[in-house]
């Protein structure tokens, strides 16, 4: 496995673990930030694994569309939209794209599940890839 890919996946794993801990402690905004970041870093690891340039974007939909051109990826357009829609409102108290956005445990669990599913897919793909020396 490419060292850069491994680093991106480790950062994604750390974000997933942080999201779970934050959810357990009722810290919903930082939980959502970490779930989104886990998905973003996982997709960037996938693109690196596929020898693609990694764009400087936080857009889950943008990254997923690029990855889906090169491999099978089980993340829906709606799931990408959800992760994209929570990014700004979970970081800043203004500029929400969701009216009256108030995060709760359910939305946090949903976002963690999406990020974790994506992480498992990419981790398995990278692990099963033939080594090139």
Model-derived features: where do they sit?
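Terminal alpha-helical segments
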Residues: 1-133
């Amino acid at each position: 496995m490419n060292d850069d890919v491994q680093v991106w996946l480790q950062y994604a794993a750390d974000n997933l673990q942080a999201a779970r801990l934050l959810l357990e402690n009722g810290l919903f905004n930082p939980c959502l930030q970490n779930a989104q970041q886990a998905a973003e870093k996982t997709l960037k690891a996938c693109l690196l694994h596929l020898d693609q340039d990694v764009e400087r974007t936080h857009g889950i939909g943008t990254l997923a569309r690029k990855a889906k051109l090169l491999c099978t990826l089980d993340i829906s357009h709606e799931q990408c939209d959800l992760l994209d829609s929570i990014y700004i409102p979970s970081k800043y108290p203004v500029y929400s794209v969701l009216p009256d956005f108030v995060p709760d445990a359910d939305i946090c669990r949903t976002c963690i599940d999406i990020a974790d599913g994506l992480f498992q897919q990419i981790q398995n793909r990278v692990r099963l890839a033939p080594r090139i020396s």
